[in-house]
Amino acid sequence: MSTNKIPSLELSMYEAFIEDIIGKTFKILPIWEDCAAEKEDFESFNSYLDKLITMLIGSNYIQKEEKIYSVLVMLKGLQQREDLTQRKVKSIVFHCIDLLKKVN
């Protein structure tokens, strides 16, 4: 883990934040599946990704971490793709989770 944290940010708070982000990242898959099953326009999926991406941008401002930047890039790419399948979404979600676990 990088050492350029804001001094007031305690390690345990940061670890809890990363665990929360892991849970939120996992939630991407069922949200996408619900949209695909209902043949929606994926507005709720994109809205959820927007919020998660915003949180990660903020966290990367506080704690410069290469793995968080990688997750940001992957989630933004996920948001931009139109050829998604359940298999692709699952693969990207679990790759992001693996990266986040390495932060903690």
Kindly give the residue locations of the regions a language model identified.
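Short terminal alpha-helical segments
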Residues: 1-40, 93-102
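Generic serine detector
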Residues: 2, 8, 12, 44-47, ...
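Short, solvent-exposed segments of well-ordered alpha helices
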Residues: 5-16, 36, 58-62, 66, ...
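Residue-level detector of well-ordered alpha-helical segments, enriched
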Residues: 17, 41-44, 67, 88-92
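Amphipathic alpha-helical interaction modules
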Residues: 23-70
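Amphipathic alpha-helical binding modules
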Residues: 69-104
